Amino acid sequence: QIRAHLNMSQTEFAEQLNVTFQTVNRWENGRAVPNKLAQSKMFDFCKEKHIPVYDMTLKRIAEESEAIKLDTDRVLLYHGSKSGIEGPIEPKSRKQCDFGKGFYMGTDPGQALTLICDYEKSKFYIVSVSVDKLAHIEVPADIDWAMLVAYHRGKMEKINGTPFYNKYRAMTLNKDLIIGSIANDRMFFVIDNFFVGNVTDMALINSLSALQLGKQYVAVSQKGCDSVHIEAEVELSYLERLFMKEVAEENRARGISLANDICKNYRREGMFFDEILDEAKSGGKQ
């Protein structure tokens, strides 16, 4: 794909990478895989030639996704795993994730890719889930989403037992599947700033609106996990992961910039997270 993008012959491509024609031929025929050193050289070469490797990865995933035929009641999603899925799917992520322990899937392949780019044994999956057969809730992209994330990340424990706390505990109780906005690399920085008191709820809500986030589907029960089908596994090369790391870093930098802009625009509007909790503790917020 890289060679075709540059309209080079195998000989020309080999010369650029300082390898033999036979080596390039073996790579392209699938008889050998470039080692890390060769892929690192390719990374520098692709950067120099402005080759959109990350976009090529997304295109490959899109083509594989389009080839999958699903029953009408199933939704196509993406999942990134740090070490691959072995055995049955279970709701066993870290407890303090956005929506608690569960099997996390999303509508945005880019989000799943940037989450696993640092892990050598990571695997990327195209999956599907049947929503209609599950007890599920879809949380709108508003303050309820942020507070539900706060609850599941353990940020609301100081008001445990209040009606406000119980509202969010009950919201996802006895559910198989939770659907809500995804805290991508940019939004992650904004919501963390909300929790530590650097931005108000108004700033957060406007960020949710401005970023047009994808959705995450989280199977939080075994029944929910049993409804998930793995449709395809997509191999990721070391070269592709290097480009994913770069994209993740760019997204985080944009998140910092966005949070700073929002801080300026909504400095005096809305309430800070601690103020919301204090009001809930005193019985003012239900």
Walk through the language-model features, giving the residues of each.
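DNA major-groove recognition helix of helix-turn-helix/homeodomain DNA-binding modules
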Residues: N35-D55
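Active-site and NAD+-binding cores of ADP-ribose-processing enzymes
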Residues: D132-Q286
